[in-house]
UniProtKB/Swiss-Prot annotation:
Family statement: Belongs to the GcvH family.
Domain Lipoyl-binding: start-end pairs: 36-118
Keywords tagged on the record: Lipoyl
GO CC, one annotated term: glycine cleavage complex
Cofactor(s), names only, from the UniProt record: (R)-lipoate
Designated name of the protein: Glycine cleavage system H protein
PTM sites of type N6-lipoyllysine: K77
Single biological process term from Gene Ontology: glycine decarboxylation via glycine cleavage system
Chain's role: The glycine cleavage system catalyzes the degradation of glycine. The H protein shuttles the methylamine group of glycine from the P protein to the T protein.
Cofactor note: Binds 1 lipoyl cofactor covalently.
Subunit structure: The glycine cleavage system is composed of four proteins: P, T, L and H.
């Protein structure tokens, strides 16, 4: 997910970046403490996109590779793909988000999760919360 850097000269953002999650530079988060792993978009991505009006999710059983466009997020501002931070097989999708995309804006790290993926054995290259904070600040 490519976000503009319009806020380069503004004050640091007051973003929620939970420590227990891992992040991609494309503004996805991954919770690998559970199986299957949970994937969503960060608060930063949700804020940049604005109010979501449509989310196109893959079907359970779909194969994803790190770097694939796996979800399409549409807002009144833009249509952006979510780039998969991991490789694996989609086990579950959040149908609540498909029915009401605004759930992602309201709770991107909780009820607004997007996918649950059974991960391959490959170790994904992800960022810690502190490393991700440097990307968005």
């Amino acid at each position: 997910m490519t976000m503009s850097d319009d806020n380069e000269n503004e004050q640091p953002l007051n973003l929620d970046i939970p420590d227990h999650l891992e992040y991609s530079e494309e503004h996805a988060w991954v919770d690998r403490s559970v199986d299957p792993a949970i994937i969503g978009i960060t608060e930063y991505a949700a804020d940049q996109l604005g109010e979501l009006v449509f989310v196109d999710l893959p079907e359970p059983g779909a194969r994803v590779e790190a770097g694939d466009e796996i979800v399409e997020l549409e807002s009144s501002k833009a249509v952006q793909p979510l780039i998969s931070p991991v490789a694996g097989t989609v086990k579950y999708v959040n149908r609540d988000v498909a029915d009401d995309p605004s759930v992602v804006n309201g709770d991107p790290y909780g009820e607004g999760w997007l996918l649950k993926v059974e991960l391959d054995d490959d170790e994904p290259e992800l960022l810690s919360a502190d490393e991700y904070a440097k990307v968005v600040r």
